[in-house]
Amino acid sequence: MNELLKVDHLTVDFSTDQGTVHAVRDVSFSVYPQEVLGIVGESGSGKSQTMYSVMGLLADNGKITAEDILFDGKKIHESAFKNHTEYEKTMQHIRGNDMAMIFQDPMTFLNPVLKIGTQLIEPLQNHTKMSKKECEQKAIDLMRQVGIPSPEKRMNQYPYEFSGGMRQRIIIAMALA
């Protein structure tokens, strides 16, 4: 069975006013279909930066060096593309349809001035051919699936109206979308 995700010798550095910060050094791993990989480590050990790199979400001052980053057998390292626009278009498709990340802090990810329903519906509208009504129903179903009580009512609430655990479940629902 072929790897779904393969990362070979990933290194991530950040340029700062104080010099170079080495966030990730020579990390390699593979994930096969139906397999779950947990990345654990101390705070600041590079777990998030590793995954931001794989998903093409690294900050502008970050630099990735990798022998290979493959998703479903295709190179997804930016150097494999003709230009940044082509890379971004490919990654946007992969992120929306094939790969998702559950962020550690939901309040960093959720927009405080947008209703939860709006934030759940947006990725569905961007990455599916469903109508707005179908997207709304799917969002309600996803909320129900992750254990959010009264999802129809919750669609019209803001992130601050949710407990920390419920906000985390909304992020999981978005990843499932």
Which residues fall in each region the model found?
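ABC transporter nucleotide-binding domains
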Residues: 1-177
